[in-house]
Amino acid sequence: MGAAASIQTTVNTLSERISSKLEQEANASAQTKCDIEIGNFYIRQNHGCNLTVKNMCSADADAQLDAVLSAATETYSGLTPEQKAYVPAMFTAALNIQTSVNTVVRDFENYVKQTCNSSAVVDNKLKIQNVIIDECYGAPGSPTNLEFINTGSSKGNCAIKALMQLTTKATTQIAPKQVAGTGVQFYMIVIGVIILAALFMYYAKRMLFTSTNDKIKLILANKENVHWTTYMDTFFRTSPMVIATTDMQN
């Protein structure tokens, strides 16, 4: 659950920073009328993720783009070295970007500016737009809560979607491993119980069904100093046969 908790914490931190940056740098607010509305949000393979849409709109699309990038950079800087080590693989899987821990911020900035300033995005004048994400996983018993922040512009929403693709890709990498890890732990516990039960039955059988002579031998074998007469007494417990002298004479 620790990994799932860290993902959720990162998602929450990222959303808070995006809202704050949009408000500070792009004069966005929840009360501003949005030129673009989110019609539908599709997750093709949803395995335990919840989604809400929040409006933080403004008229300055370029400032929105810069605000989103600034929030992403600050959030990445706050990750632990272990968390940062996973990020390049997430970029490759989600955005097909080849990057490294040291260049990930610059590479993401270049990707967003090139993609979100393209004519396909800028010329999109649809007032109601749909957002499609491939897949998202929640940890067992703990759904991942996502927040898509609608900036009110195609540019800003393009950058938000890029970040959403990264965070959902992180859930697909970690949550299934947690499920698999839980299964391995379960089987290891079962195997351990079986081994202990077998050992118990073995010793119980030795103690309950071993002959009296064998029990005495086992007990004596565990003693450090045993007088030889004790062994004699043990091995000759059966009374000797008495042969009459008359029989021998006959």
From Swiss-Prot:
GO cellular component: membrane; viral envelope; virion membrane
Membrane topology reported for the UniProt record: Single-pass membrane protein
Effect on the protein upon substituting residue 49 to S: 75% loss in virus production
InterPro entries (UniProt xref): Virion_mem_poxvirus_L1
Predominant cellular place of this UniProt entry's protein: virion
Induction text: Expressed in the late phase of the viral replicative cycle.
Post-translational modification: Myristoylated. Disulfid bonds are oxidized in the cytoplasm by OPG088 protein.
Cystines in this chain: 34-57, 49-136, 116-158
Subunit annotation: Component of the entry fusion complex (EFC) composed of OPG053/F9, OPG076/O3, OPG086/G3, OPG094/G9, OPG095/L1, OPG099/L5, OPG107/H2, OPG143/A16, OPG104/J5, OPG147/A21 and OPG155/A28. Except for OPG095/L1 and OPG053/F9, each of the EFC proteins is required for assembly or stability of the complex.
Protein name: Entry-fusion complex associated protein OPG095
